[in-house]
Amino acid sequence: MQPKNCTILKKSKQELFPCQTFILLTGKVKNTDSLFYQTVFRSCPLKYWLLQAGVSMLINRSDSTNLVVQARGLKFTNCSISQRTVLRQGLKRQSITTKESSCFLLWEELSKSEEVNSSLLFHTSWLMVTCCLKYIYMYDICTCFLFCAFVTSIFIETDYSIFFLLTASRGIAQF
């Protein structure tokens, strides 16, 4: 069911994103109604939301209002706060469904002429590494850095990808 007054952008080859910057969210579910996360926000309007399929979370907006979004491989744009009851699609307003220590990507729209701040790239890279290292007890450190290299090569810059690849290769060479 398509939300009223909302445009659903289906996945395509271009991904329909006007920018290359992403925000990494990390957090845990506590009392089933709050999601604590670390992120870096930019002073620009949030119009494009991309969450992992089937993930629901409570997002704190800059205007101190809450918007519950459930995304199933879809991107919602031009959806106002008042339409949150439509977007949640039958979920309780405070219901958050996710896995502990999971990573999620939240895309933020930037104007096409705006250049990506290097400090933002640094902070998002640091958050990504922090999130990746949450799995250090499940996977070895080399796997983590290989994962980071893969993600950075797609979403950020080649220099970051090379750094993670070199770090991972050094670790593999030691075994």
UniProtKB/Swiss-Prot annotation:
Localization annotation: Membrane
Membrane topology of the entry: Single-pass membrane protein
Keyword Transmembrane helix on entry: yes
One CC-aspect GO term: membrane
Up-regulation conditions: Highly induced during the diauxic shift or during carbon-limited growth, and also induced by mild heat stress.
Positions of transmembrane segments: 143-166
Domain of life: Eukaryota
Record's keyword terms, sorted: Membrane, Stress response, Transmembrane, Transmembrane helix
More details: Partially overlaps TKL2.
Protein name in UniProt: Putative uncharacterized protein YBR116C
Organism: Saccharomyces cerevisiae (strain ATCC 204508 / S288c)
